[in-house]
């Protein structure tokens, strides 16, 4: 139905996160019903992004500039590096607007199940960044491990903290616990335990 071109469009859309075959079919229909205002501008924007966007050689962010706009922002606190698993995590942290330091994208987490070891992660570049900052006026003094609250995230944070400690920087982790608006009776035991351990003065 619709020919091979339409089926290819639907199949490619269905590969996107959050879109299954039915959602992809609806999206394709919307795009094709208004090609001048939806489909063609989207296609042009995707081509422009494919040509212009690159991976930042410093932190691993995606940007049209290399180094990226975060790494070159003079208002950032150069003494802080927040380590995240993915570019999506970097964008989420930055969108929250509570952190004004630099970032480092690890590119994954250690996972015995998936066979992901230290060699697959971008941690040597983090060590080089810390080392090369030492002669500057603003050396890296703290590394914040902002990895997911999963077994793999916790394992990676523990392993990375062990690698970082000999470098003489403060290594911290994000507190974990009760989300804003979360009711206690619907939280799992692990979340409640983490919240209790991360309690602070009221």
From Swiss-Prot:
One Pfam family here: RecR_C
CDD domains in UniProt: TOPRIM_recR (cd01025)
UniProt keyword list: DNA damage, DNA recombination, DNA repair, Metal-binding, Zinc, Zinc-finger
Keyword Cytoplasm: no
Gene Ontology annotations of biological process type: DNA recombination; DNA repair
Location of the Toprim domain: 79-179
Top-level taxon in the UniProt lineage: Bacteria
Keyword Magnesium assigned: no
PROSITE patterns, per database record: TOPRIM
GO molecular function, one term: zinc ion binding
Renumbered zinc finger spans (C4-type): 56-71
NCBIfam families: recR
Cited function: May play a role in DNA repair. It seems to be involved in an RecBC-independent recombinational process of DNA repair. It may act with RecF and RecO.
Family stated for the protein in its record: Belongs to the RecR family.
Protein name listed in UniProt: Recombination protein RecR
Lineage start: Bacteria, Pseudomonadati, Pseudomonadota, Alphaproteobacteria, Acetobacterales
